[in-house]
Regions:
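Phosphate-group recognition and catalysis centered on beta-loop-alpha active-site segments
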Residues: 1-256
């Protein structure tokens, strides 16, 4: 059986960039979410660490993405959101309300139309895991949570297994001064763990831009990669790896 795979567009924090990633061959996107309660919209899609710092409301992003998917024949198989900032002490006291309002927007402006599409919510620090637990009342069978930086597969497994939640694991770097291959041992550990536990559903890495890095992680058995070179990774999968890997579709549930 071929391995279902997710090419995840890197920082598609505008609908235009998201659609470009999908047209280039991605089947997943992971925009950044910031919570700014001082504004009426509260949830915004942008990242302070990227060049594109324009604040776009989550509402407008979801409406635009939904409309674009309706107009274009694109294969979006997974919608992931990287939740930032993680959890300050002030933030923790609002986390229940945060998740309630977050899912209200997700369901009203997107999942009311695309309910079959899998959803993944991630945080980039171990301290963010309690926030993800607050999402539990709203998660459905094709939705899960995960940690994508600064943790270990075993710690993530222990935490979310206790909470009876399906989860994903990732690690990597976008730094020009460090190779994602530095994280190969911990990703290998996660892939091995996935083979032995039902709860760990998805293992991926970031940001894989060179063919060497892509091949290393494809051979390792990951389920996906975040990349800024979508067409390069897609070509590699469609040629050298087409016998063992196939692109997931919206009908596939990685969290089943």
């Amino acid at each position: 059986m071929k391995r279902k795979f997710y090419i995840i567009g890197h920082n598609p924090n505008s609908v235009r960039n998201a659609i470009r990633c999908l047209k280039d061959g991605a089947n997943a996107i992971e925009p950044d979410i910031r919570y700014l309660p001082q504004y009426e919209e509260k949830f915004f899609v942008y990242d302070l660490l990227t060049l594109d710092r324009k604040q776009r409301s989550l509402r407008d992003y979801l409406i635009g993405l939904s409309a674009a998917l309706n107009d274009e024949k694109l294969n979006l198989a997974l919608l992931a959101f990287d939740l930032k900032p993680i959890c300050s002490k002030d933030f923790e006291s609002e986390s229940v309300l945060y998740m309630k309002e977050f899912f209200e927007q997700l369901n009203e402006y997107f999942f009311s139309t695309y309910s079959q599409l899998p959803l993944l919510l991630t945080v980039g620090k171990p301290s963010g895991k309690p926030l993800l637990v607050k999402a539990k009342p709203w998660l459905t069978a094709n939705q899960a949570v995960g940690v994508d930086e600064g943790d270990t597969p075993e710690n993530v497994k222990d935490f979310f297994t206790r909470e009876d939640m399906s989860f994903a694991f990732a690690d990597g770097t976008s730094s020009p001064f460090a190779s994602p291959l530095k994280f190969k041992p911990i990703i290998k550990e996660a892939v091995t763990l996935k083979q032995h536990t039902h709860e760990l559903k998805l293992v991926y890495t970031w940001t894989a831009n060179s063919e060497k890095t892509m091949r290393n992680f494809l051979d390792l058995g990951v389920d996906g990669m975040i990349t800024g070179r979508v067409s390069r990774l897609r070509k590699l999968i469609d040629t050298e790896y087409h016998d063992t890997i196939e692109m997931a579709t919206a009908e596939d549930n990685p969290f089943a």
